[in-house]
Amino acid sequence: MNSEKQSRQWAHGADMVVGQLEAQGVKQVFGI
């Protein structure tokens, strides 16, 4: 397995999740 590629995919997914949370205004809840 190419762990480097897997890590990049995970990081990209995390960025998408954070973007969605921010779009929903959840970032205020977490105080980010």
Curated annotation (Swiss-Prot):
Associated pathway: Polyol metabolism; (R,R)-butane-2,3-diol biosynthesis; (R,R)-butane-2,3-diol from pyruvate: step 1/3
Entry keyword set: Transferase
The protein's Enzyme Commission number: 2.2.1.6
Reactions the enzyme catalyzes: 2 pyruvate + H(+) = (2S)-2-acetolactate + CO2
GO terms assigned for molecular function: acetolactate synthase activity
Enzymatic class: transferase
Tagged with keyword Transferase: yes
Record family assignment: Belongs to the TPP enzyme family.
Subunit and partners: Homodimer.
Other known facts: Does not seem to require thiamine pyrophosphate.
Record-given protein name: Acetolactate synthase, catabolic
Organism the protein comes from: Klebsiella aerogenes (Enterobacter aerogenes)
Gene: budB
